[in-house]
């Protein structure tokens, strides 16, 4: 008997040492991955056999403070907000207070869309499977993109609507319902859809893709589609609850839902994919400078979630998942996510630190000035150039786009990107010439020709049904590129450039009678019209009445 006890103790010791070795290996690998991708920090939890197996919090909260993250540091959950909310919806379904297939208008009249009779068809099931027909976010008045229940169309607006229904059924704010139903029962003490004062001392700052910290959003109202603040410590508790809840797994089973493509369907609150390791539920999160990813294997009670404070956070999803699961991931292909080691990301990141010609040199064909298109596609180079252009690194963008034209001299997309770069530099003539080339190569899109005319101050053809409106912006004499964007041009901040005329930036547009919202965009900065006293107090959009 003593020998047996010693053997058992020895086996337990070996198992423990193996787990420690795996953990150390994973920690080293995670640090390498985020460093290579230019990500300040990652918070990750790995669930196995229905319980928390490993957790990692490594990196820094801010590029400036260098303060390390820990297991209580709060991150933005982005669209993981939807998955957590879906669990609370399930609780209402289980208590028979909500029927997934009963039209929502019978619970609550949603005034934002009630003018369209199709809103009477929408159910909770449609919203949870992203088949409500609503857009992701409204641009002005909320309108249906598609008929309800017919096809997949990712929609945050749908979740906002469903949260109003939940508030009507429960008689309390959705944040209070989430606290009572999910957060407090699961001891998720660092989770809320509204910013809490106790978060002030320990939260991660968001960072751009070139590792610059940006302003943190502190949500004052609950948005169940996007505003959840949490971390891997709390989210692991949520995942453990879901993976061990047989009723939830049967109610929200993985073999139902609406198809996204042949390998992926969307079930209630999660995407579903079939992998070589088994069926998964997944959800990604993208709030710009916070990125997250969650995946579970319900049949194995296994899963992983990670949070990052970087615009590059989803670029590491493939590398992170490989550390824990030896499986294909169709969802990552569908989301078009590369590895952190992918040439597209490495050229971009290295080009921030050195001349971009040197960064791309390893990917040129030997002895030539042409790109190895197996490693870097035409669209990849355009994507990198566009990211540089957004940062104001115009010379880097032009270098890449001109190199792309060596490989693809008839690439309309390259000319379009080149035209926009020249435009933002303030080189009107070069930009107009380039936009004309883009139009000549691809007449499927007529906006390049329209934009070339606007840049050269050639007026649009007169439309007698519309009224000519002249907008002026005084000052900003040193600006390179000024435009006006609004509800009249789908908030496109490039299509309506302004010209410096007699001491002010000026443009003329033709509009039908109605009410419009707009802003000026000065070298990428959106501003309210200082001459117009009529503006929206929430968005600060200037309001234009055309009679």
Which residues does each PLM region occupy?
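Alpha-helical scaffold elements that line and support the substrate/ligand-binding pocket
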Residues: 44-46, 50-51, 76-99, 103, ...
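Catalytic loop of the DD-peptidase/beta-lactamase superfamily, centered on the K-T-G motif
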Residues: 24-57, 167-172, 176-180, 184, ...
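N-terminal leader/targeting segments and the immediately adjacent pre-domain N-terminus
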Residues: 3-12, 18-75, 91-99, 129, ...
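Catalytic-site signature segments of enzymes, centered on catalytic residues
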Residues: 74, 129-202, 216, 221-236
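Short active-site loop at a secondary-structure junction
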Residues: 33-43, 64-126, 144-157, 223-226, ...
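Aromatic-rich carbohydrate-binding modules that target alpha-glucans
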Residues: 460-515, 521-547
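Active-site helix/loop module of the DD-peptidase/beta-lactamase fold
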Residues: 23, 76-80, 92-135, 169-211
